[in-house]
Amino acid sequence: METEQPEETFPNTETNGEFGKRPAEDMEEEQAFKRSRNTDEMVELRILLQSKNAGAVIGKGGKNIKALRTDYNASVSVPDSSGPERILSISADIETIGEILKKIIPTLEEGLQLPSPTATSQLPLESDAVECLNYQHFKGSDFDCELRLLIHQSLAGGIIGVKGAKIKELRENTQTTIKLFQECCPHSTDRVVLIGGKPDRVVECIKIILDLISESPIKGRAQPYDPNFYDETYDYGGFTMMFDDRRGRPVGFPMRGRGGFDRMPPGRGGRPMPPSRRDYDDMSPRRGPPPPPPGRGGRGGSRARNLPLPPPPPPRGGDLMAYDRRGRPGDRYDGMVGFSADETWDSAIDTWSPSEWQMAYEPQGGSGYDYSYAGGRGSYGDLGGPIITTQVTIPKDLAGSIIGKGGQRIKQIRHESGASIKIDEPLEGSEDRIITITGTQDQIQNAQYLLQNSVKQYSGKFF
């Protein structure tokens, strides 16, 4: 009696009679098989969570997380951390990961409140031990949510595609918003991929991304993000105080209304992304900083904070002059706008005009230099214009007036200006700290203005 061949031994050399060709339906079956076989492989998904929401995944006495492990035969963990973030790790095949996410997503959106028995009975549960994984105010999955995936930085290119073609296709096909943050998580090689939309669409998008990156080997060293190293001065797409202040509304989705810059595919009716986002869409993987201009030595490194520095603005009514680090004319160009502790930041820049601010951020004349990313092609921000980077130095004893308690001031400045702002730790033996500002020209000018006012208002009032 003829026995059925297992799927794993599907012959690649099968022929169709004497013609030696495969029928079209067989080709389609093989393609479907390849996809299903790939989804059966074990993969790991890591999701960045707010620490306060981890309890809903774990449940009282660990009942929820134990039920997820048992019902889906998967590895699910949420290691503890001392900061505001934790990482949800799920190891299973891609389809199972999708089912687990559909259980978990509602509680990540809603918080830790236990739903009513009526709400619980309306949703099919694998186990009544996961009864708190429900969304109280919505039936089914008709609500917006977002998840933050963690991926190795070398895998970003596979998600973005050539000239952004892949990420655009993902957005359109899954009807989600996808944002790949430029900055790596603190002390790691991980980057955040923010995905927003209806839960089913978000899950489908994540499954496609997992399928993409599971076929790509990681290049370079791997240092997974440890939430214990949370640092509010990094602009990597993690959770901040701003998220809590907005009563849990996802950062990627502002309230409905006019004025937003709509990055959704046309005809979808999704919520727009705001023009004041502190990051910009990354349409190509960052290759590190561009080389310094001739005759200038870059500080090295691969982070935006290490990009070459723009020239300072010239004095009014005069030619471009060299300035020393105290902001005074001198015979040596240091290449960095600097301020000393005794004269304070605002005293040095209070008198700058808008045109002088502009000259501080734009490449000048024949020695012009493109500060944009992506190998000179340039990136464009939400408000138009190339993304550029500039740096300023401040005395380290003034940094507190910018950062604020728990980093609240610097977060607010980032949010209001739309620029990425990073503050370096002082180098050994140095009395200065370097502030790196990345964004469009308008965003950088707004950030400089807000930073100046912060120093002016809070100087001497340290946290």
UniProtKB/Swiss-Prot annotation:
Biased segments, Low complexity type: 252-266
Modification sites for Phosphotyrosine: Y380
Region (Interaction with ZIK1): 209-337
Region span, Disordered: 1-37, 250-329
GO cellular component: anchoring junction; cell projection; chromatin; cytoplasm; nucleoplasm; nucleus; podosome; ribonucleoprotein complex
Stretches for region 2 X 6 AA repeats of D-R-R-G-R-P: 245-329
Region called RNA-binding RGG-box, residue ranges: 236-273
Post-translational modification Omega-N-methylarginine, affected residues: R316, R377
Cross-link (Glycyl lysine isopeptide (Lys-Gly) (interchain with G-Cter in SUMO)): K422
Gene3D superfamilies: K Homology domain, type 1
Comp. bias (Basic and acidic residues): 19-37, 276-285
Positions of region (Necessary for interaction with DDX1): 1-276
Matches recorded under SUPFAM superfamilies: Eukaryotic type KH-domain (KH-domain type I)
UniProt cross-link Glycyl lysine isopeptide (Lys-Gly) (interchain with G-Cter in SUMO2), position: K34, K52, K60, K163, K219, K405, K422
Residues recorded with modification N6-succinyllysine: K219
Pfam families: KH_1, ROKNT
Phosphothreonine: residues carrying this PTM: T39
Phosphoserine: residues bearing it: S36, S75, S116, S214, S216, S284, S379, S420
Task performed by this protein: One of the major pre-mRNA-binding proteins. Binds tenaciously to poly(C) sequences. Likely to play a role in the nuclear metabolism of hnRNAs, particularly for pre-mRNAs that contain cytidine-rich sequences. Can also bind poly(C) single-stranded DNA. Plays an important role in p53/TP53 response to DNA damage, acting at the level of both transcription activation and repression. When sumoylated, acts as a transcriptional coactivator of p53/TP53, playing a role in p21/CDKN1A and 14-3-3 sigma/SFN induction.
Name recorded for this polypeptide: Heterogeneous nuclear ribonucleoprotein K
